[in-house]
């Protein structure tokens, strides 16, 4: 439900839990936002990393009205592992809003792109399909490995069902440790760095986020260290 204080403001759609938004979900959000004059900022940076059973729907593709009431942010940095080249795209159909964005990125001096990033983006989008398909298969296999490991060794720590991306949320409420404290203790006591769920707001309290975009041996070692940590509490 859109609160009255949001009328005329902005709403940011992001996915920190690995869900692939269904078209009908986006339609419901978009209709509410348009009705209340809310601009949707859709963070679609992980859009290429969708598992075969699911389908990515660009928010702006739903209708012309949605396109003009949204700002879409994408980048090849996640799917093609080129974050160090610092390049991204802001897609905005509304001319007035686009002018404000252009002025803002110039005022903040983040408008210039890395020439190597431009070339890497062109190569990634034009010639990276085979590599990307293999990556998605590997990421899904990593998730299935983690899911089976948790069922067998960590049943008291449920994880989200990953539909895309490489970020898995684990429910650690039973430990009774604040997420930020748990983050530091895992680093100091287990040599394992996970992200505290509270980085996404109070709703993330009690959750930890795993990045499984790594060799399976690294993931296995991380799960082993986490298991050892919780068993020694």
Residue spans of the language-model regions?
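Active-site pre-lysine segment of PLP-dependent enzymes
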Residues: 14-39, 46-82, 96
């Amino acid at each position: 439900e859109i609160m009255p204080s949001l009328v005329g403001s902005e709403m940011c759609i992001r996915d920190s839990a690995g869900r692939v938004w269904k078209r009908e979900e986006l339609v419901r959000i978009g209709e509410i936002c348009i009705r209340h004059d809310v601009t949707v900022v859709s963070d679609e940076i992980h859009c290429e990393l969708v598992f075969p059973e699911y389908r990515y729907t660009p928010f702006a593709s739903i209708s012309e009205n949605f396109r003009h009431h949204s700002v879409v942010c994408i980048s090849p940095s996640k799917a093609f592992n080129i974050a160090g080249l610092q390049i991204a795209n802001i897609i905005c159909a509304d001319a007035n809003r686009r002018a404000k964005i252009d002025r803002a990125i110039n005022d903040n001096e983040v408008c210039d792109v890395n020439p190597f990033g431009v070339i890497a983006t062109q190569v990634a989008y034009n010639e990276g399909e085979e590599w990307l398909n293999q990556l998605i298969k590997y990421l899904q296999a990593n998730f299935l490995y983690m899911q089976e490991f948790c069922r067998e060794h960590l049943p008291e720590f449920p994880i989200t069902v990953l539909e895309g991306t490489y970020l898995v949320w684990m429910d650690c409420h039973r430990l009774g440790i604040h997420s930020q404290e748990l983050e530091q203790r895992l680093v100091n006591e287990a040599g394992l760095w996970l992200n505290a769920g509270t980085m996404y707001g109070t709703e993330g309290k009690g959750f930890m986020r795993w990045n499984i975009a790594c060799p399976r041996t690294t993931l296995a070692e991380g799960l082993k260290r986490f298991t050892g940590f919780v068993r020694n509490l």
